[in-house]
Amino acid sequence: MANTTFSGPVRSENGFQQISKNATTGTVTVTSGDKFAVEATGSAGIEGTAAVYVTQVNRLKSDVDTNVNIVKSTIMIDLTDLRDGGTAGDIIGKDGDGVAFIAQVTTANQGTVFGVTMTCLETPAGGGTDIDLYSATEGTGVNDTAIGDLTETQIINAGAASAGTMVAGGDIAADQYLYLVGQGTGHAAYTAGRFLIEITGYDVAS
């Protein structure tokens, strides 16, 4: 496919997507500008009434020398109407309303992860403010159950969150589901609380 150069502005009403095309089958795959390949569905146990749950995956094109893409994956979530658990270490989510993972990290979608940050954009209220990020092999965790019941790894130990706090964490293994985990002891509904989770990875350009 030939390259095209534009001298004026290029506009798109609904955004841009980067794709790859299989030379044999012709199958087109969106590689950048799309949501997580595996994210929470509309009826899942992690979307609160504020309905602010957005994921985005973008690949920054490599240079010809390294042939490696930087992959930036972002999750924005509002905790309003979600609940923390009754015990420290319980999964945050909707009360009795399905699995509560926020996304799945895969090598094909996020690349090899080498860094994660979690920024608090709005101070949590109603529920506890000590909220951590975990990964787990299983995508079956629900609200008010222990993250320790899953095959889990703590990614970010955030401590008490308030607007403007940002905490960095370690890498995330392939094919892991992500959960927000409360460290409080109440089972209260959140009335506020917004977080931005940013995952940085890399993969070899195809």
Label the model's feature ranges.
Residues 2-206:
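Surface-exposed, low-hydrophobicity beta-strand/loop segments enriched in small/polar/acidic residues
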